[in-house]
């Protein structure tokens, strides 16, 4: 299908509004990244979304955009609240897949002799892989509380510190969640998966600070020096979130016969009971994901204490920030000079509110919302902060990762498992995985250049680079 694409600035591209499109499509990318997007259906999928009713301003594709289910991954779309479409495919199957960054008071020299032991201990405590269950087996009644209260349930039950909830987007809890909107099938899948990583591109990394770009902001977030040890957790709502998406997609597919450019964009009208139930179930799955990352944090803290034989106060392991990158949120944005309440979908995109935004607090309000962009296995990750330009360009959103460029099938054919492990060892990275496939599918070559994605994000003024981290150990499914 022919896409009319015009370049309107160094890193800004547009598919002009025409035909059935209700708004133009804006793509933020370098020449190199836009060429990658042309290789799959990213641009076609973004144009399809622009044809949906009630969409405002423009459909956005972030620099890490690539083909997904329905809308592209790296897609951001905002809709007026005048009975807009509620689109499960625009949140995706891994509801509140997100990342959490922890900082320590340690340098790599203090732990390098025990790094292998530490990785093994975390691997024991935090299961990874498809369908893997965790240490916690919840009754359905208890699981309902997790779904309704998110991170609050975890902290109230001793799995965290009081200050943890103040270092999480939305305080780790969406108040419109309702466990009754989540099917029993989804609950059965999720009841023993709290505190687990899962498979695919999910991981837990022990990292070190590689470079600090803004010392004042880094210090405010607890990042003080090069070679300081950090931990990055990347996971979501596991089988429960996947089932929520499947349940509602199936229901909407059967019940609503709207003329959509792609059946994967099936939706229910916001004012319908079905749409409201999906939003309640999505919020419940998001709460589950925040509780999941909280339980993993708890076990990481316990593992560090045991292996290093130090108390947690001297180790640190405070949360720098935790954010969602697959979610729908109700937010206020300025459209044509007027403030409007909108529903904003971010699918493979990170909220990036600027300094002073009313939804931020403490040091985040002063410096901007932290944006954590993980790289692929073996490559750097970045900490940035949201900037004012994000509100104008991308509904307060930023990139979320490197963005896949090779399918899992193709990635597996490039190297043998032993070759990948050897290459990573040569880079000084320990890898512990449940399966060989999990490593082969996630080789660095399967992803776009993280440095390029971050550079474009920074130069556009969407987010500002604060620090870069490099992995020393990776745990995968």
From Swiss-Prot:
The keyword GTP-binding applies. The keyword Transcription does not apply. Keywords: GTP-binding, Ligase, Manganese, Metal-binding, Nucleotide-binding, tRNA processing. Its cofactor is Mn(2+). Signal peptide: none annotated. GMP binds at residues 201-205, 325-326, 374-377, 381, 400-403, 476. Mn(2+) 1 binds at residues 94, 97, 202. It catalyses: a 3'-end 3'-phospho-ribonucleotide-RNA + a 5'-end dephospho-ribonucleoside-RNA + GTP = a ribonucleotidyl-ribonucleotide-RNA + GMP + diphosphate; a 3'-end 2',3'-cyclophospho-ribonucleotide-RNA + a 5'-end dephospho-ribonucleoside-RNA + GTP + H2O = a ribonucleotidyl-ribonucleotide-RNA + GMP + diphosphate + H(+). Essential for tRNA splicing and maturation. Acts by directly joining spliced tRNA halves to mature-sized tRNAs. Joins RNA with 2',3'-cyclic-phosphate or 3'-phosphate ends to RNA with 5'-hydroxy ends. Ligation proceeds through 3 nucleotidyl transfer steps, with 2',3'-cyclic phosphate termini being hydrolyzed to 3'-P termini in a step that precedes 3'-P activation with GMP. In the first nucleotidyl transfer step, RtcB reacts with GTP to form a covalent RtcB-histidine-GMP intermediate with release of PPi; in the second step, the GMP moiety is transferred to the RNA 3'-P; in the third step, the 5'-OH from the opposite RNA strand attacks the activated 3'-P to form a 3',5'-phosphodiester bond and release GMP. This is tRNA-splicing ligase RtcB. It comes from Nanoarchaeum equitans (strain Kin4-M). The lineage of its organism: Archaea, Nanobdellota, Candidatus Nanoarchaeia, Nanoarchaeales, Nanoarchaeaceae.
């Amino acid at each position: 299908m022919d896409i009319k694409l015009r370049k309107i600035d160094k890193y800004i591209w547009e598919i002009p509004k025409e035909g059935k499109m209700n708004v133009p499509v804006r793509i933020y990318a370098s020449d190199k990244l836009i060429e990658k997007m042309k290789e799959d259906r990213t641009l076609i999928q973004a144009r399809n979304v622009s044809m949906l009713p009630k969409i405002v301003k423009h459909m956005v594709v972030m620099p890490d955009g690539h083909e997904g289910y329905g809308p592209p991954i790296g897609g951001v779309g905002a809709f007026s609240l005048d009975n807009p479409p509620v689109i499960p495919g625009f949140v995706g199957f891994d509801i509140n897949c997100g990342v959490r960054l922890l900082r320590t008071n340690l340098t790599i020299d203090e732990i390098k002799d025990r790094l292998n032991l530490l990785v093994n201990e975390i691997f024991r405590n935090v299961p990874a892989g498809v369908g893997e269950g965790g240490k916690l087996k919840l009754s359905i009644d208890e699981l309902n509380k997790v779904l309704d209260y998110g991170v609050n349930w975890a902290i109230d039950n001793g799995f965290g510190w009081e200050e943890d909830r103040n270092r999480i987007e939305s305080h780790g809890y969406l108040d419109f969640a309702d466990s009754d909107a989540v099917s029993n099938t989804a609950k059965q899948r999720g009841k023993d998966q709290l505190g687990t990583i899962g498979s695919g591109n999910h991981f837990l990394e022990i990292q070190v600070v590689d470079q600090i770009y803004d010392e004042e902001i880094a210090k405010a977030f607890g990042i003080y020096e090069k070679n300081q040890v950090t931990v990055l957790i990347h996971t979501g709502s596991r089988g429960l979130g996947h089932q929520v998406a499947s349940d509602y997609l199936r229901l909407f597919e059967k019940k609503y016969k709207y003329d959509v450019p792609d059946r994967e964009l099936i939706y229910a009208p916001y004012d319908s009971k079905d749409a409201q139930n999906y939003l309640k179930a999505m919020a419940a799955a998001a709460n589950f994901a925040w509780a999941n990352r909280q339980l993993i944090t708890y076990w990481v803290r316990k593992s560090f204490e045991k292996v290093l034989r130090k108390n947690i106060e001297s180790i640190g392991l405070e949360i720098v920030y935790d954010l969602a990158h697959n979610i729908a949120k109700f937010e206020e944005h300025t459209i044509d000079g007027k403030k409007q309440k909108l529903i904003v979908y971010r699918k493979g995109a990170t909220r990036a509110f600027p300094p002073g935004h009313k939804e931020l607090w403490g040091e985040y309000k002063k410096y901007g919302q932290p944006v954590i962009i993980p790289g692929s296995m073996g490559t750097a990750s970045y900490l940035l902060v949201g900037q004012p330009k994000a509100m104008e360009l991308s509904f307060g959103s930023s990139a979320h990762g490197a963005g896949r460029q090779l399918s899992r099938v193709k990635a597996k054919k490039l190297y043998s498992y032993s070759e990948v492990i050897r290459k990573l060892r040569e880079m000084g990275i320990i890898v512990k995985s449940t399966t060989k496939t999990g490593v082969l599918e996630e080789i660095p070559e399967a992803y776009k250049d993280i440095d390029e994605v971050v550079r474009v994000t920074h130069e556009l003024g969407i987010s500002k680079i604060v620090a870069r981290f490099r992995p020393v150990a990776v745990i995968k499914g």
